[in-house]
Design a protein with these regions (language model features):
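Short, conserved loop/turn and helix-capping segments at secondary-structure boundaries
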Residues: 39-40, 174-178
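A short, acidic, flexible beta-alpha connecting loop/helix-capping segment that sits on the rim
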Residues: 163-166
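Hydrophobic, lipid-facing positions within transmembrane beta-strands of outer-membrane proteins
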Residues: 2-6, 43-47, 99-103, 142-146, ...
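A short, acidic/glycine-rich surface segment
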Residues: 128, 168-170
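Solvent-exposed loop/turn segments connecting transmembrane beta-strands
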Residues: 138, 170-174
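C-terminal closing repeat unit and adjoining cap/tail of repeat-based domains
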Residues: 144-161
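Outer-membrane beta-barrel "beta-signal"
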Residues: 51, 150-152, 176-182
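Detector for outer-membrane/organellar transmembrane beta-barrel domains
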Residues: 11-138
Length: 182
């Protein structure tokens, strides 16, 4: 069965919008305990916005929350956590609650040059003692990014970026990294 989505967007000028969206999905799995196929529903809600505070300042952000939508969240998309084992029910799976959001601010120095900064968080929540046997599994990630972009032409953009990221596992073991991109 495909994922079903719906969205509605309100624009109040060329650079400003508010968008609401939803997704419902079904995930099927086979149980080795009863040799039957079972399914779990996943669902999520999203809200996003972008608007000008002044002609040079723009605010933007997005929030996503749901169960079984890890493939749609940046840090969670490669972890295969849309549907996971339920340690309390042998042979059964479950969907976990997850949250992702970011908020940022952009300043347009000129028509072709801008700087921006963004903070983001992705989080996977535990249910039914999962992941009881994987304490080093990803629980939460955060990043803070600052960048500078120059639109050289309509088809060429160059930029530089600094990113600081933090990761916390279910064992509460924190890690961090710094990165420069150009």
């Amino acid at each position: 069965m495909p994922d079903f989505t719906a969205s509605a967007q309100y624009n109040w000028n060329a650079n400003s919008h508010l968008k609401l969206a939803a997704i419902v999905r079904s995930m099927t799995y086979s149980s080795s305990v009863d040799n039957k196929a079972h399914s779990k529903a996943g669902y999520g809600l999203q809200a996003s916005t972008s608007f000008n505070v002044t002609p040079k300042w723009q605010v933007y952000g997005q929030v996503n929350h749901g169960k079984g939508i890890g493939q749609y969240l940046n840090d969670l998309s490669n972890l295969n956590v849309d549907i996971v084992p339920n340690p309390e029910k042998e042979g059964r799976m479950q969907t976990l609650p997850m949250l992702g959001w970011f908020a940022g601010l952009q300043y347009n120095i000129s028509k072709n040059v801008f700087v921006s900064g963004t903070y983001s968080l992705s989080r996977l929540y535990s249910e039914h003692t999962y992941p009881s046997d994987e304490p080093d599994m990803y629980r939460k990630g955060q990043y803070l990014v600052a960048n500078l972009f120059w639109n050289v032409t309509s088809n060429l953009q160059v930029g530089a970026e600094y990113l600081r990221g933090w990761r916390t596992d279910f064992s509460s073991n924190p890690r961090h990294a710094n990165r420069m991109n150009a």
